[in-house]
């Protein structure tokens, strides 16, 4: 009789392979995850799961695999500051912006180098959100890094200015790195940051495929051996 350990490993690898092939071969498949970072002068929940509505602020990111390229869809939502649905979409493969839509408020971003971009000028420089090879992307090296996208790296350190004297400005700092090969359809990414340090964050990945593989492995083992 096949050993229990070997049996589980074989079933797991088989199901994992099916899931990975399905994700990588389908155009337009999406993986949704949520990042919860530290906002310097606002109160918000430290950890957010999935894309559920919560009081406070959060940043959600979607990765889409399409024709071998990665498109980063980053949306900044702020219930407190009433900057709702500000949407910026970049093509990480060739560093061009696909589209941009904002909520109607004037929003300014300050990037890692300290350069400030308005919503209008930022459309031409959005690709610094995206990077490859595990390097921190920036305005000048993003094109070279994205020539070989084998990982997804997002690094943010900017200030959002609502251009409204009645609404407080705030700064968002976050860092996220994830190997592209580890991202699968249905994954739920959650991250939390210590409010005492806006640059630190911890993250966990829950993979439904792993859980299902485990259940099926146990079920098949019980059926065949008892």
Swiss-Prot record:
Organism: Schizosaccharomyces pombe (strain 972 / ATCC 24843) (Fission yeast)
UniProt keyword Flavoprotein, yes or no: no
Functional description taken from the UniProt entry: High affinity heme transporter involved in the assimilation of exogenous heme during conditions of low cellular iron.
Molecular function via GO: heme binding; heme receptor activity
Signal peptide: 1-20
Official protein name in the record: High affinity heme transporter
One GO term describing the cellular component: vacuolar membrane
Residue ranges the record assigns to the propeptide: 200-226
One record GO biological process: cellular response to iron ion starvation
Consequence the record notes for mutating residue 87 to A: Decreases heme binding and cellular heme import, and abolishes plasma membrane to vacuole localization in presence of heme
């Amino acid at each position: 009789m096949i050993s229990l350990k070997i049996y589980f490993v074989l079933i797991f690898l088989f199901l994992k392979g099916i899931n990975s092939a399905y994700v990588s071969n389908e155009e337009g498949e999406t993986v949704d995850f949520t990042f919860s970072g530290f906002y310097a002068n606002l109160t918000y929940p430290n950890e957010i799961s999935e894309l559920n509505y919560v009081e406070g602020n959060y940043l959600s990111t979607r990765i889409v695999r399409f024709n071998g390229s990665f498109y980063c869809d980053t949306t900044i939502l702020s219930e407190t500051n009433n900057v709702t649905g500000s949407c910026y979409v970049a093509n990480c493969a060739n560093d061009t912006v696909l589209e941009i839509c904002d909520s109607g408020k004037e929003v300014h971003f300050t990037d890692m180098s300290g350069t400030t971009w308005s919503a209008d000028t930022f459309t031409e420089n959005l690709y610094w959100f995206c990077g490859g090879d595990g390097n921190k992307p920036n305005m000048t090296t993003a094109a070279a890094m994205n020539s070989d996208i084998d990982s997804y790296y997002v690094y943010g350190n900017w200030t959002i200015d609502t251009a409204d004297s009645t609404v407080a400005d705030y700064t968002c700092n976050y860092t996220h790195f994830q190997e592209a090969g580890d991202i699968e359809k249905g994954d739920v990414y959650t991250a939390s940051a210590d409010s005492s340090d806006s640059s630190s964050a911890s993250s966990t990945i829950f993979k439904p495929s792993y859980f299902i593989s485990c259940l099926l492995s146990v079920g098949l083992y019980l059926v065949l051996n008892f």
